[in-house]
């Protein structure tokens, strides 16, 4: 056998990650059994689905997950008759870790609070490796359904694993844990039974446990979603939620209903109470599980649009054939009708829950950026989503909505004003809002990464145009400032054309500003051009050619501008001053100066002249 034993190193960073899993989650060691049983049940479901189109994959009549502790040998085995794994599958699935990246998992685990760490295991797809919390050696013997070959993967979690030929009478997988000296409790049948009932009671695949030489049932095995709501406790909902999401919190919202009539389906959906550590921004597809008459078919049916992908759970229907293929699913009108109905139900729930501002703020902070994607992607639901959006504002603390903003608009105000950037706190201090604040006009502050895009698809709310203040300087002429303006306005007749000539390659226009009160300069968007934040993103993406040129605005009442205007009227050279003003505008907007070295030199020279 030694001649055929293959030794392999784990994928990059796996050694460090294994150490993190073992030590950071030590106090939650029981979750290893949850993860291994869930993997086994999933393998059974996948073989059952495959058998619908390939009879050779048919499951045995007594298909179940078996848990067998052996105190004498100090081993714990979890066996399943599922789809199994080939040699290549073992190397790919167990020899490398976390498709989403070990570095991301490691960082999240290091940053998480102790009570948040267990949920990371399932979210990052590293559940199998939790076995090393209780075992100093793990052996996985597997035979893929449809193949006669079996292989054993083995590791002590020390940076390498081995692969060797094996024998297994039937397709499926055996995971054997050699239990550590300090983990004796996981050899006790009663302790194992308690864990299974806690974490896996709602898995529909039967689970049995070897106790006193006899197999006893470990789980109820009923489809929770098939039960009437009146028969399901909050504790049962929470347990099932934790099973499908790998979270340890309680759901923010639970939706459980039966649709009958033109469509016949049952749904049990959850909106999580916290944002997963594996950011939903990175996963673009909905993973709600589709079942047909209780049988799992796929979690890739797209039962919800991508902008509701944070919703998790199960939809079980009678209106599709059991042998439906994943390819056929995308073409069947039944699925489209179910998708429409489920989406409508979730939207109605969000609308209802939004009435509780404090509770809704919890949801919004976790999933608001994802919901905003629907404004860009989904014209059918655009207006409904708009009513659910929440923003920071210059007028109120906390979150506010478009509807609340409209209720506070000044009598002669026609538009809803927004400012888009990278940081809400920085936006609140931005020079862009000085003129609006001086006139008592509220501005909504948008700082999520998607905020640069979706306003292009939503041009109004409740009949009120939505305008970026970087494009709306002219609107201020209709409002008088509250209080006296500070300082005398400079005559910019000589200065403006000189600056425009000097900066002709960098700005579309140079003009006096209505919006500046305290700051000397700012950049705004050209009329008809993209918003400043969109220009910024285009430049970062190397697509500056599509960004257009900004407008440089000067505050004629600012001492610096007045001094430069005097020099221009006196016929002095203002070339250096022009470059410095433009760089100041870039820095004030949160961007670096175009040439940091030259900018620093000019500033140093100006300070030296004042010394």
Swiss-Prot record:
InterPro entries membership: HATPase_C_sf, HSP90_C, Hsp90_fam, Hsp90_N, Ribosomal_Su5_D2-typ_SF
Keyword field: ATP-binding, Chaperone, Cytoplasm, Nucleotide-binding, Stress response
SUPFAM superfamilies with a match to the protein in the record: ATPase domain of HSP90 chaperone/DNA topoisomerase II/histidine kinase (SSF55874), HSP90 C-terminal domain (SSF110942), Ribosomal protein S5 domain 2-like (SSF54211)
Keyword rRNA-binding tagged: no
Gene Ontology CC terms, in alphabetical order: cytoplasm
Main location: cytoplasm
SMART domains the UniProt entry points to: HATPase_c
Family membership: Belongs to the heat shock protein 90 family.
Function statement: Molecular chaperone. Has ATPase activity.
Name of the protein: Chaperone protein HtpG
Source organism (scientific name): Methylobacterium sp. (strain 4-46)
Top-level taxonomy: Bacteria, Pseudomonadati, Pseudomonadota, Alphaproteobacteria, Hyphomicrobiales
């Amino acid at each position: 056998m030694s001649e055929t034993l293959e030794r392999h190193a784990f994928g990059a960073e796996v050694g460090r990650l294994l150490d993190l899993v073992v030590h950071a989650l030590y106090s939650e060691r029981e979750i290893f059994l949850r993860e291994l049983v869930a993997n086994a049940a999933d393998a059974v479901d996948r073989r059952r689905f495959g058998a619908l189109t390939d009879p050779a994959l048919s499951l045995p009549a007594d298909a179940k997950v078996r848990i067998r502790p052996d105190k004498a040998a100090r081993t714990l085995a979890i066996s399943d008759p599922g789809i199994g794994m080939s040699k290549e599958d073992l190397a790919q699935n167990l020899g490398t870790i976390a498709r989403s990246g070990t570095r991301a998992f490691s960082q999240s685990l290091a940053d998480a609070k102790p009570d948040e760490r267990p949920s990371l295991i399932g979210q990052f797809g590293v559940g199998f490796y939790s076995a090393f919390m209780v075992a100093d050696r793990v052996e996985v013997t597997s035979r893929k359904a449809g193949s006669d070959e079996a292989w054993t993967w083995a590791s002590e979690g020390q940076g390498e694993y081995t692969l060797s030929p094996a024998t297994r009478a039937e397709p499926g997988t055996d995971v054997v844990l050699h239990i550590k000296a300090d983990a004796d409790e996981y050899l006790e049948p009663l302790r194992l039974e308690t864990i299974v009932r806690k974490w896996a009671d709602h898995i529909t695949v039967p689970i049995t446990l070897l106790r006193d030489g006899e197999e006893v049932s470990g789980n109820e095995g009923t489809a929770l979603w098939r039960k009437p709501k009146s028969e399901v406790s909050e504790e049962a909902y929470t347990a099932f939620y934790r099973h499908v999401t790998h979270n340890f919190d309680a759901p923010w919202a639970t939706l459980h209903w039966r649709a009958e009539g033109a469509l016949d389906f049952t749904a049990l959906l959850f909106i999580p109470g916290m944002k997963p550590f594996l950011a939903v921004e990175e996963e673009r597809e909905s993973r709600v599980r589709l079942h047909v008459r209780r049988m799992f078919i796929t979690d890739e049916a797209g039962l919800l649009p991508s902008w509701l992908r944070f919703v998790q759970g199960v939809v079980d229907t009678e209106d599709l054939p059991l042998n439906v293929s994943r390819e056929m699913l995308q073409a069947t009108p039944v699925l489209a009708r179910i998708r429409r109905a489920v989406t409508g139900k979730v939207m109605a729930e969000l609308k209802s829950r939004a009435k509780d501002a404090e509770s809704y703020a919890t949801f919004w902070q976790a999933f608001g950026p994802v919901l905003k994607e629907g404004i860009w992607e989904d014209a059918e639901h655009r207006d409904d989503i708009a009513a659910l959006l929440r923003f920071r504002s210059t007028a109120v603390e906390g979150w506010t909505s478009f509807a609340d903003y409209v209720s506070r608009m000044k009598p002669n105000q026609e538009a809803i004003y927004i400012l888009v950037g990278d940081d809400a706190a920085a936006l609140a201090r931005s020079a862009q809002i000085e003129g609006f604040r001086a006139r008592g006009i509220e501005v909504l502050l948008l700082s999520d990464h998607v905020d640069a895009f979706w306003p292009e698809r939503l041009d109004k709310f409740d009949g009120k145009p939505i305008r970026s203040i970087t494009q709306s300087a002219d609107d201020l002429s209709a409002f008088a400032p509250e209080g006296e303006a500070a300082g005398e306005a400079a005559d910019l007749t000589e200065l403006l054309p000189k600056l425009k000539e000097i900066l002709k390659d960098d700005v579309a226009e140079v003009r006096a500003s209505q919006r500046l009160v305290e700051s000397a300069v700012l950049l705004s968007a050209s009329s008809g051009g993209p918003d400043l934040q969109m220009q910024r993103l285009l430049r970062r993406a190397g697509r500056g050619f599509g960004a257009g040129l900004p407008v440089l605005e000067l505050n004629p009442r600012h001492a610096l501008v007045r001094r430069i205007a005097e020099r221009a009227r006196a016929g002095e050279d203002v070339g250096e001053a022009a470059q410095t003003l433009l760089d100041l505008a870039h820095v004030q907007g949160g961007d670096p100066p175009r040439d940091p070295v030259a900018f620093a030199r000019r500033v140093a020279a100006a300070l030296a002249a004042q010394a």
